Each structure stands twice: as structure tokens, then as C-alpha cells.
């Protein structure tokens, strides 16, 4: 059964014109885009999104960075999309991320690593509901799915 994940191109990725490259990588893997929007993250939304890091020393920097410019928020659907997206993104630290991964190819530092993706079904559900209303997500079938699954 297909699952959904939340993927966000962070402000550094938007500024560096990487949205199209990132969308293309997910499409080429056969995943289906069901929601997307360019948006400015409010401080309140950023604090909710990063709530699990609230007590960490870098929390303020996370919030400041994610609110520093527009992000491109997306919901992708497909078989094992959460695990596959994590693999496609690469390690959080771009210096440790393998070449061919999004962070390995485009990330600069841990703080400017281009992309965020949900790390579990629970976080995917939470993050999707933070950034999207249900009516903003579009379910549809593609003929190519028969060739992929």
C-alpha cells in the first residue's frame, strides 16, 4: 500500500534554484506528487515543526533559518516513499552524505542542507497536517503505476 511523506525544500534550496531538480528526482523514482506550495513559514509554524528540538541548543537557529525565506513544501505518495526519500536525501551532514544523494550533491553544511523529509509514518502524518489542509492534497491515479508496482 502506498504511503505519504512530507518533503520540504529549505530556504537555501529555494534560493539556489533547486526545486525543479529535487522534484525531478522524486518523479524519476516513480513517486506521485499530491500536494505542493511555495510558502513563507511563520515563526509559530516553525516552532511547531521543530517542537521535538525545543530544548536543544540549536533550536533558535533552526527556527531562524527556516523562516529566513520561502520554502517549497510537498507531499509525495508511493510504495515505501518515507524510507526511499530518506535514502535519496542522504545523511543530514552533507559532508557525510554519499555522492548522488540530494545533500551529497547540493548540501553545504548541516544547517544549510537543502531539504527536509519525514523520518517515520508518525512524523509524516504530523508534518503533513501542519503544512497542508486535507483539501489541498489531490488523490489521483496514474497509468504508469501499473508499470511500477
Swiss-Prot record:
It is found in: Cytoplasm. Its cofactor is Mg(2+). It catalyses: a 2'-deoxyribonucleoside 5'-diphosphate + ATP = a 2'-deoxyribonucleoside 5'-triphosphate + ADP; a ribonucleoside 5'-diphosphate + ATP = a ribonucleoside 5'-triphosphate + ADP. Coiled coil: none annotated. Its EC number is 2.7.4.6. PROSITE patterns: NDPK, NDPK_LIKE. Homotetramer. This is Nucleoside diphosphate kinase. It comes from Geobacillus kaustophilus (strain HTA426). The lineage of its organism: Bacteria, Bacillati, Bacillota, Bacilli, Bacillales.
Amino acid at each position: 500500500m502506498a504511503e505519504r511523506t512530507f518533503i520540504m525544500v529549505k530556504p537555501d534550496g529555494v534560493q539556489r534554484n533547486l526545486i525543479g531538480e529535487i522534484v525531478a528526482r522524486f518523479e524519476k523514482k516513480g513517486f506521485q506528487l499530491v500536494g505542493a506550495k511555495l510558502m513563507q513559514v511563520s515563526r509559530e509554524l516553525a516552532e511547531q515543526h521543530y517542537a521535538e528540538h525545543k530544548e536543544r541548543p540549536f533550536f533558535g537557529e533552526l527556527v531562524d533559518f527556516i523562516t529566513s525565506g520561502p520554502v517549497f513544501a510537498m507531499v509525495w505518495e508511493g510504495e515505501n516513499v518515507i524510507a526511499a526519500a530518506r535514502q535519496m536525501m542522504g545523511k543530514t551532514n552533507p559532508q557525510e552524505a554519499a555522492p548522488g544523494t540530494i545533500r551529497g550533491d547540493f548540501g553545504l553544511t548541516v544547517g544549510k542542507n537543502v531539504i527536509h523529509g519525514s523520518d517515520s509514518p508518525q512524523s509524516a502524518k504530523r508534518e503533513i497536517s501542519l503544512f497542508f489542509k486535507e483539501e489541498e492534497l489531490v488523490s489521483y491515479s496514474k497509468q504508469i503505476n501499473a508499470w511500477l508496482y
